[in-house]
């Protein structure tokens, strides 16, 4: 649920680039984020097929917009490749390895939407194969296109020193190089792609809540699993997901703090999955042939993924006045993480501890049947 405020924040950034004369205040940011969540919830309540189509359109459009802008920027270079090693007169201290790792870690957050979009491949007949293939293809394509766009954008900056102090650096560079018309077209396409990301993100949240409720892992499972007779969608789950996505925007007015907390907290499930997967692999899993497999690369990729996500979490949770301030006894990210852990622990002891595994521990070793 915490991801949706971040998506709404990105929508505010895109709108400010499209309407340069518009001054977006904090109230505007909250309202736009809430409207984005509501609109996504309404669309999800109609049909999962409609959502999948809109998601596909958004992914393709975003890649085309980024690639088109990158090609255009490459024809308006103001910098040479040597700018990649320039500090723009900023004094460095020690090795640049750690700043480089921090920047790369932050770029990972740009890939979350495409990974979420790949989850819609579960709606195909080969649900054990297609999601993995779609996610890998989506991440690889996104990484390549983002690399080209970021490189082209950096080379097209007229003055790197001034750009570093410009809060509207991307719109200004696009307008300077390609004209206001193309810049607005770029951000118009970005609005569609960001909204499709909002739909994909909320749909994934709904699917997660519904799946846990169906297995009796959440309170109010009867309400959460009740399907609409007309659309066959879990309207109760959709409503809960939208409301929980909006609540952080209402109670926390510091948008950068919300985004930073979201960035950190969404990394924790990845670490848990990687950790559990590493234990299983060290125990010899998988013991049978699978239709999709990483083969001998499975263990090293799992270790590398676990180490990298820990680095990302370490960076996101670092105490900072702007993004991770002390709003309580601890920095806000640590406060939220501990709060979520305590609530989950209480629920586990109160309700889940004695419940049997709905599928059985051996189910994970069974080959998929399509």
Region spans (language model):
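Terminal cytosolic tails of multi-pass membrane transporters
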Residues: 277-301, 319-370
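TM-loop-TM module centered on a large, flexible mid-protein loop between adjacent transmembrane helices
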Residues: 16-22, 90, 134-199, 218-258
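Hydrophobic membrane-spanning alpha-helices of multi-pass integral membrane proteins
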Residues: 237-246, 272, 298-316, 339-341
């Amino acid at each position: 649920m915490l991801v949706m405020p971040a998506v709404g924040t990105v929508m505010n950034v895109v709108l400010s680039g499209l309407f340069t004369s518009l001054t977006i205040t904090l109230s505007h940011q909250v309202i736009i984020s809430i409207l984005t969540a509501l609109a996504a919830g309404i669309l999800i309540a109609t049909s999962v097929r409609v959502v999948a189509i809109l998601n596909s359109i958004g992914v393709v459009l975003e890649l085309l917009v980024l690639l088109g802008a990158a090609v255009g920027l490459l024809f308006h270079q103001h910098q040479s490749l040597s700018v990649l090693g320039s500090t723009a007169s900023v004094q460095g201290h020690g090795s640049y390895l750690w700043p480089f790792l921090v920047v790369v870690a932050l770029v990972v957050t740009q890939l979350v939407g495409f990974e979420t979009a790949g989850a819609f491949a579960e709606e195909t007949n080969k649900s054990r194969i297609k999601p993995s293939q779609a996610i890998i293809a989506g991440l690889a394509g996104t990484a390549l296109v983002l690399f080209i766009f970021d490189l082209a954008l950096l080379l097209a900056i007229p003055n790197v020193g001034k750009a570093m102090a410009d809060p509207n650096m991307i719109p200004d560079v696009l307008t300077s190089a390609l004209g206001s018309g193309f810049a607005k077209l770029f951000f118009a396409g970005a609005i569609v792609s960001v909204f499709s990301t909002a739909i994909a993100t909320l749909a994934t949240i709904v699917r997660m809540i519904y799946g846990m409720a169906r297995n009796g892992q959440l309170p109010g499972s009867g309400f959460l699993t009740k399907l609409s007779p007309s659309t066959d969608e879990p309207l109760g789950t959709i409503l809960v997901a939208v409301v929980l996505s909006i609540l952080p925007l209402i109670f926390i007015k510091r948008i950068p703090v919300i985004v930073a907390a979201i960035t950190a907290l969404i990394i924790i499930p990845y670490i848990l999955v990687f950790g559990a997967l590493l234990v299983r692999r060290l125990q010899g899993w998988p013991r049978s042939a699978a239709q999709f497999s990483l083969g001998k690369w499975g263990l090293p990729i799992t270790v590398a993924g676990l180490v990298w996500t820990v680095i990302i979490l370490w960076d996101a949770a670092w105490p900072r006045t702007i993004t991770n301030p002390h709003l309580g006894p601890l920095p806000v990210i640590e406060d939220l993480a501990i709060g979520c852990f305590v609530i989950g622990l209480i629920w586990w002891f109160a309700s889940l501890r004695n419940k049997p595994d709905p599928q059985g521990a051996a189910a994970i070793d069974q080959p998929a049947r399509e």
